[in-house]
Amino acid sequence: MPDPATYRPAPGSIPVEPGVYRFRDPHGRVIYVGKAKSLRSRLTSYFADIAHLQPRTRQMVTTAAKVEWTVVNTEVEALQLEYNWIKEFDPRFNVRYRDDKSYPVLAVTLNEDFPRLMVYRGPRRKGVRYFGPYSHAWAIRETVDLLTRVFPARTCSMGVFKRHKQIDRPCLLGYIDKCSAPCIGRVSKEQHRQIVDDFCDFLSGKTDRYARELEQQMNAAAENLDFERAARLRDDRSALKRAMEKQAVVLGDGTDADVVAFADDELEAAVQVFHVRGGRVRGQRGWVVEKPSAPDVSVEEQLVEQFLAQFYGDQAELGGAADESVNPVPREVLVPCLPSNADQLSSWLSGLRGSRVTLRVPRRGDKRALAETVQRNAKEALQQHKLKRAGDFNARSAALQNIQEALGLADAPLRIECVDISHVQGTDVVASLVVFEDGLPRKSDYRHFAIREAAGQGRSDDVASIAEVTRRRFQRHLSEQNDPNLLSPEGKSRRFAYPPNLYVVDGGAPQVNAASAVLEELGIVDVAVIGLAKRLEEVWVPSEPDPIIMPRNSEGLYLLQRVRDEAHRFAITYHRSKRSKRMTASALDAVPGLGEHRRKALVTHFGSIARLKEATVDQITAVPGIGVATATAVLEALRPDQPGGAQ
């Protein structure tokens, strides 16, 4: 691995002007492309303190063997050159927005003599117009079925088209007027293309014009007493309206805008964009990408900048053949934050569009509400991505193998247990222990602990709490292992008799050393112990001064992160439950023999604890299920200063 000091340029040799830089590996391959307002400031930050760089950035700097740069006149030129180089070199450490091929789109093959409407999944191609994506293929077919009444464009494959051309007879859609039958010459090539262009215009948001035209034609036919044609036009108008109703108005001013939102965790970010044309949502797209890691720029600003540059640059290269509109760049782009070079980005986008493009953060009204909806979609997309990735067998196998190799284990850790501590300023201190087997959660084995020795009187010691939980968990393991009566009839271990291959604690060196010391004290030597620290996602092992840095895109780190997050969730859930019970506790809780149902009956009967406190034994025994002994115990609990509680 190259030493960054061997290729670090002298700060004085780096220009202060804006420009674009490239990192190359020892084989000369470009592994990262970036741009900067000041090349000297940005490049110096990569080498100033490598230990404090984000893991992905640190890996890039230590993988590279050379850095070079190109000076440009303006930041807009730097933006364009960065985009071109990323397209040319496809650097491994750059975030790339690739099409999500899992959702179907409506494709219009404008590159054919007789364009076709079809359901499509796959990479975008030049000369093909796309609308969507849609959640289901049937949603596309339903839309096409409605609109081909008005825009009878071809929907058949090339094989079907040629066959009907040979037999000189249209298909069924041609007979019922849902296809203009260009295969038999019913319309010319130019007429059919006009039909397709009108179809595309309608889906692009120019809906009102066609609705007005149909209404005018219908009225004219009725005035000419051509009622059959008027009825057909009426049905066509109804079909258009039903298609329009499927896309509700979200912006009352009829704005053309793209609304962008992000959701992220420690490793990845989900990107969602809603395409609004004519005030209606015409499409939705999403990606999940690795988080960018430039050392001196906020993550959200980097996400906004990189998304705008790559997405709209790609759309412009398709020559307007995208699903967003005839012009792939809308008049307005709504983003969660404005990057520092927002003016330059706006100028670049304006150049792509040919007219002014505004970047804006929505603050109120319909646009703010829509941005919040897109944000919720981004969060849901990230969650679905995490669940899908965790459930994939190949990914889980790779994750376990990654962990085995990174930690130097003899075998893959098929059973992983993780401990997390939760409290609020030392109160209600609890711990959780979650179990993953074969990379998936085994929720029946989850346990929670109320911390006894390491907490109390508003104090909490996370290190001591980790040690206490570890001791209790593995003492149970040893006791169940030594007592055959605790085994099930099938010989399977109950509770904690089955030890983990890997024991994970939430924290750094102090926590992992505490857990390791307990295992050593108990004589357990076949359980590996690690700590996973937050923020930098460092993996700590006992008695080692430095952590292990696993690649941020590795399946192994992803699994460890998910195990840790699940332990955190389970601990917080138990902590909230315990805190809620404490805050809602009453003096009645301590009355022996008084269960929850009879407590509720008493409070319901008297209306409050204060009124119950003023009652007599006879009044309390009037409540169904309450005897004299219980009534006396209730009054003793409520009136500790009055012996016997008698009144």
Swiss-Prot record:
Residues 208-243 form the UVR domain. Residues 16-95 form the GIY-YIG domain. Keywords: Cytoplasm, DNA damage, DNA excision, DNA repair, Excision nuclease, SOS response. SMART domains: GIYc, HhH1. It is found in: Cytoplasm. It holds the Pfam family UvrC_RNaseH. GO terms for biological process: nucleotide-excision repair; SOS response. One of its GO terms (molecular function) is excinuclease ABC activity. One of its GO terms (cellular component) is excinuclease repair complex. Interacts with UvrB in an incision complex. Belongs to the UvrC family. This is UvrABC system protein C. The lineage of its organism: Bacteria, Bacillati, Actinomycetota, Actinomycetes, Mycobacteriales. The gene is uvrC.
